[in-house]
Amino acid sequence: MALEDRTPGQELGRALRELTAGQEGRPMFVELYGGREAGPGGGIGALELRRAAVETAGCRERFDQREWIASGSEPSWRLEVTGRDMMLNVAGSPAPQRGAHGGLSRSPGAGVSYAASDDPGFVVVFEERRCIDPLSGSLFAYAVEVRSEGRSYSGCAAHNPAMPAP
């Protein structure tokens, strides 16, 4: 089945070249918006690139009940958000920080956010804008900022594709 790159600026093709570094046959995981072309020889028309990575579990990645998975570096950290709580794991910390939240809040032009019910300083804000992981070069549709225990962490996020978009 043929794939036609109709993304702005041929972003899909550019991501393929940059992430695979010219290594023919290197697998790349992508999430995209597009449509199936009708008729004989019809393929897929890619309209928007949502996520692209080579060093990932890709389709095997398990979101389970998680709505969001986010990560960043300096220091290395990972965030998971479910329908009820959020958990921040920072490298070097003795234990992950966990907090129940009251659901997402929308702010016009500022994305969606979650705040821990029992710790108003534990706040997560997801913004729909291109984010490129500085270590892997992977592309994401969401940028994230996490504030916790007086610190701020910035990184990239993936939304569970099996759940409604925020």
Which residues make up each language-model segment?
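Short, solvent-exposed aromatic-acidic interface loops
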Residues: 52-54, 73, 93-94, 157-164
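Surface-exposed beta-loop interaction hotspot
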Residues: 39-83
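Short, surface-exposed linear segments at secondary-structure transitions and domain or protein termini
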Residues: 9-15, 104-112, 133-137, 160-166
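Short, compact, well-ordered microdomains
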Residues: 138-161
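Small beta-barrel nucleic-acid-binding modules, principally OB-folds
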Residues: 1-28, 118
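Central antiparallel beta-sheet cores of small beta-barrel/beta-sandwich binding domains
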Residues: 1-8, 66-125
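Flexible glycine-rich surface loops and low-complexity tracts that mediate binding to linear polymers
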Residues: 21-45
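Short, solvent-exposed beta-strand/turn "edge" segments of beta-rich domains on protein surfaces
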Residues: 19-23, 131-136
